[in-house]
């Protein structure tokens, strides 16, 4: 199916709906205009009481003389008439064109307003300026019909010409009732339509999916960078929507469902939008949480309504973001099989591949928790194809940066390949944030273009947080932080299998970091060896060991370091088989492969004995203790470098990789320290200053 056809179909649907609404409102306006016209006609019609009409008929027996319009003259009467909702004293005369109907008497009269004469107020005379002729009047008759006979006899006796009114037609007889009923029906329809609209309190069972046309999306595969493999996987879906006959003549069928899995921020939603933009078909977008409601059965009703809307516009795409909110494994909830979420999931399973499933609807979904999804949802026939949208490699990051810097004025010295190299592990959202941070920093510094310095500072802001220059520490705490970070940097520089140190700083950043040591990998890594994990543990422990060597006590600042080191050691024992317990896995994990913290997946220890658990704890303690001894030995040998680096940090607060290398090379007693190759008798520097441990510990 071509792109033009999809857009035209959706535009026609919208145009028909708009025309129907316009016609409805025009009809509603016509009814209101008719009622207003009837009200205006009645307002300008003079009402005459029955008794006044009898008096006027009796007075009309005499010869009327308009030159003698005085009180008591024949042919007229003085009455109080209600005209235009105002009660006035009027003189009524010249009764004519009388029409006698079953419920009312109509005709024409002449009216002239009376004005008081003198100050007593008992004399009135007509005001010729207010004379109105041919005024329509109406006198209502009683339902019993006796008044009609009496007034007809009086009119005949007065020789006043009259005629009987024609019998009222069905419309005239029931016009007010019909108009009132139409108005009430129109009001009820509008109220029900408003209540049933999305977002209203009564729209329980209606789907909250939003329909997008191709021109509203404006996104194609050219806007998607860094995930070329994922794009190639989904191109077949677009090709099928454009020309399905190519696949059908070979007996093939398009996947009914495509599941996009990957870490947050990698572009899963963007890829789905690009598919809809390329295919040119209607695109329904909604979140998994849109099906969840406090009322029982609402989620299943919304699923059915969503597919009904989609089938009416097939071929089309339904995109469900955050599918894990809807499709978690059944039976895991507290409420068991009667859980509302499970009813919603069952409805989705039936709609995707049941007796009444529609092949013209393609379901796409995105999640970063595929391990929590129900197996029935992932089987072939529902989500046939699983597309991994993983973190981009260095080439992918460079392509993503090229997309985001299109509207950014860059300095000629900016090398996007270098920026991609210093951002391993960054996803598309991180890189977009990095470019924006660099542009903001350049604007804050009144620069005309964004340079490499802004990108480097942006990387630090994204990874370590914002600098807290107003957070002032006392000299004792600042010195302790300097030794702590110097210990990290020195051990990371000395050990093999560690990432190069890019920067050491004692400027507080983020929420709780009083200092940081930034290491940048030289490339993308997918595996870690046992020696690399041990080196990482030693780097984490170096800060607190440096504090202990210099100050003979430790502070609370190493809390996060100890937590991370212990976690690595425990995983080495329980998951990776890197301990004396052998190549055995002791943990059943439901951790997410795409979330940095593992998500909230449940982890439990396999059925092992108490003795094995005790041995695991002993192995964790052994790995930590051996790492502490190695770190202590390195820092004892490199104490001169530790003190020199600390003094430099106290002066400038930040040391980059080049200056770090210079300081360590100048104060090193020999080649780089490698565990197991240290000289037996290594002399310490005799020029080291003596530092007294402060009494105040660093917190946080």
UniProtKB/Swiss-Prot annotation:
* Classification via SMART domains: AAA (SM00382)
The record lists ATP as bound by 262-269
Q: How is the cofactor bound?
A: Binds 1 zinc ion per subunit.
Cytoplasmic topological intervals:
1-20, 193-700
State its location(s): Cell inner membrane
InterPro entries xrefs: AAA+_ATPase, AAA_lid_3, ATPase_AAA_core, ATPase_AAA_CS, FtsH, P-loop_NTPase, Peptidase_M41, Peptidase_M41-like
Parts of the chain on the Periplasmic side: 42-171
Provide the transmembrane region boundaries.
Answer: 21-41, 172-192
Q: Give the EC number(s) under which this enzyme is classified.
A: 3.4.24.-
Xref: Gene3D superfamilies: 1.10.8.60, P-loop containing nucleotide triphosphate hydrolases (3.40.50.300), Peptidase M41 (1.20.58.760)
Q: Which Pfam families match?
A: AAA (PF00004), AAA_lid_3 (PF17862), Peptidase_M41 (PF01434)
What are the GO MF terms of this UniProt record? ATP binding; ATP hydrolysis activity; ATP-dependent peptidase activity; metalloendopeptidase activity; zinc ion binding
Provide the Gene Ontology terms for cellular component.
Answer: plasma membrane
Major localisation: membrane
Its placement in the membrane is given as:
Multi-pass membrane protein
The active site of this protein is located at 485
* UniProt keyword list: ATP-binding, Cell inner membrane, Cell membrane, Hydrolase, Membrane, Metal-binding, Metalloprotease, Nucleotide-binding, Protease, Transmembrane, Transmembrane helix, Zinc
The cofactors required by this protein are: Zn(2+)
Residues bound to Zn(2+) are 484, 488, 561
**Gene Ontology terms describing biological process:** protein catabolic process; proteolysis
Q: What does this protein do?
A: Acts as a processive, ATP-dependent zinc metallopeptidase for both cytoplasmic and membrane proteins. Plays a role in the quality control of integral membrane proteins.
Q: Which NCBIfam families match?
A: FtsH_fam
Which PANTHER family does the annotation name? Answer: ATP-DEPENDENT ZINC METALLOPROTEASE YME1L1, METALLOPROTEASE M41 FTSH
Which family does this protein fall into? In the central section; belongs to the AAA ATPase family.
**The protein's assembly and partners:** Homohexamer.
UniProt name for this protein: ATP-dependent zinc metalloprotease FtsH
User: Which species expresses this protein natively?
Assistant: Pirellula staleyi (strain ATCC 27377 / DSM 6068 / ICPB 4128) (Pirella staleyi)
């Amino acid at each position: 199916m071509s792109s033009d056809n999809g857009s035209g179909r959706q535009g026609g649907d919208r145009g028909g709906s708009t025309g129907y609404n316009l016609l409805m409102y025009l009809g509603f306006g016509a009814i209101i205009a008719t009622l207003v016209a009837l009200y205006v006609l009645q307002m300008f019609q003079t009402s005459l009481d029955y008794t006044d009409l009898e008096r006027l008929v009796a007075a009309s027996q005499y010869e009327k003389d308009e030159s003698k319009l005085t009180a008591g003259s024949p042919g007229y009467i003085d009455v109080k008439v209600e005209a235009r909702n105002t009660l006035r004293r009027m003189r009524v005369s010249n009764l004519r064109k009388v029409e006698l109907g079953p419920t009312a008497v109509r005709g024409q009269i002449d009216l002239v307003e009376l004005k008081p004469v003198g100050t007593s107020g008992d004399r009135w005379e007509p005001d010729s300026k207010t004379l109105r002729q041919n005024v329509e009047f109406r006198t209502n008759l009683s339902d019993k019909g006796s008044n009609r006979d009496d007034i007809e006899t009086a009119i005949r006796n007065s020789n006043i010409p009259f005629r009987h009114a024609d019998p009222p037609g069905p419309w005239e007889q029931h016009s007010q009732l019909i108009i009132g009923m139409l108005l009430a029906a129109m009001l009820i329809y509008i109220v029900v339509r408003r209540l049933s609209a999305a977002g209203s309190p009564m729209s329980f069972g209606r789907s909250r999916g939003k329909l997008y046309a191709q021109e509203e999306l404006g996104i194609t595969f050219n806007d998607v960078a860094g995930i070329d493999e994922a794009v190639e996987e989904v191109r077949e879906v677009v090709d099928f929507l454009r020309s399905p006959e190519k696949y059908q003549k070979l007996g093939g069928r398009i996947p009914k469902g495509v599941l996009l899995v990957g870490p947050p921020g990698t572009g899963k939603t963007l890829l789905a939008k690009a598919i809809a933009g390329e295919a040119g078909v209607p695109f329904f977008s909604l979140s998994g949480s849109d099906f969840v409601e406090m009322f029982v059965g609402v989620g299943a009703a919304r699923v059915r309504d969503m597919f009904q809307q989609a089938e009416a516009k097939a071929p089309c795409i339904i995109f469900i973001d955050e599918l894990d909110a809807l499709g978690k494994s059944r039976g895991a909830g507290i409420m068991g099989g009667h859980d509302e979420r499970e009813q919603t999931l069952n409805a989705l399973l039936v709609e995707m591949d049941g007796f009444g499933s529609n092949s013209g609807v393609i379901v796409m979904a995105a999640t970063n928790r595929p391990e929590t999804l129900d197996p029935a949802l992932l089987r072939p026939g529902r989500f046939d194809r699983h597309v991994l949208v993983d973190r981009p490699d260095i080439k992918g990051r460079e392509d993503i940066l090229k997309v985001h810097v299109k509207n950014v004025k860059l300095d000629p010295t900016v090398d996007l390949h270098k920026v991609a190299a210093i951002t391993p592990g960054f996803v598309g959202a991180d890189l977009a944030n990095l470019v924006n941070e660099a542009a903001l920093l350049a604007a804050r510094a009144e620069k005309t273009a964004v340079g490499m310095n802004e990108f480097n500072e942006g990387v630090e802001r994204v990874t370590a947080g914002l600098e807290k220059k107003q957070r002032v520490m006392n000299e004792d705490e600042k010195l302790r932080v300097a030794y702590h970070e110097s210990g990290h940097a020195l051990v990371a520089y000395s050990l093999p299998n560690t990432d190069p140190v890019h920067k050491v700083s004692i400027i507080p950043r983020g929420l709780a970091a009083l200092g940081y040591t930034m290491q940048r990998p030289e490339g993308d890594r997918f595996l870690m060896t046992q020696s690399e994990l041990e080196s990482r543990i030693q780097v984490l422990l170096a800060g607190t060991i440096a504090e202990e060597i210099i100050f003979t006590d430790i502070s609370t600042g190493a809390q996060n370091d100890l937590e991370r080191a212990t976690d690595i050691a425990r995983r080495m024992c329980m998951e990776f088989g890197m301990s004396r317990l052998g190549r055995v896995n002791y943990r059943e994990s439901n951790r997410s492969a795409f979330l940095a913290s593992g998500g909230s997946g449940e982890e439990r220890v396999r059925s092992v004995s108490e003795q094995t658990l005790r041995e695991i704890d002993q192995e964790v303690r052994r790995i930590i203790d051996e790492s502490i001894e190695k770190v202590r030995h390195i820092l004892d040998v490199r104490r001169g470098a530790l003190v020199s680096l600390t003094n430099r940090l106290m002066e400038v607060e930040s040391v980059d990789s080049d200056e770090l290398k210079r300081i360590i090379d100048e104060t090193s007693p020999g080649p780089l320290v490698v565990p197991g190759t240290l000289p037996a008798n290594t002399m310490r520097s005799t020029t080291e200053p003596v530092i007294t441990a402060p009494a105040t510990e660093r917190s946080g």
